Amino acid sequence: MKRNTESAFKWIVGILQRHNVSFQISGGFAARLYGSNRELADIDIGIPDDAFEVIYPDIKSFITHGPEHYKDNEWDLKLMTLKYEGQVIDLCGRDTIRIFDKQTKEWIPAHRDLTISEDKEVYGIMVPVIPKEALIAYKKKILREVDIADINALENLV
């Protein structure tokens, strides 16, 4: 199935808004909104940890993972992955999210405050996006190849 990012974005944002769930666009999708041009992998959206159960009835048939605690080499968080019209969407719990700082070799809190955002228009909808500085800051901590590409693109924009 061909990926329909716009349709998936409008679908999940509509559900979050209908349930009055605070949210924030982050990750590679946010980086693209700020000017990175790398290929989009998924749509990352931060939500409060207790919001998963609120939206569950509306999204349950699209869940491919979770909601559950997830930890890998970079992330430690509550995570649920959805697939809608070929587009992967990661819903990330923001209350306890941590990232692994590759410089200090320590787990540290990631940007958690969903009220500190930049409003951006995406597909005709105004949505809260992680501030560019916070996005760059966490990408400088986890330093995956995609993060380095985003950092280079975002820091070199005039």
What are the language-model segments listed below?
Residues 1-158:
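Compositionally biased terminal segments of proteins
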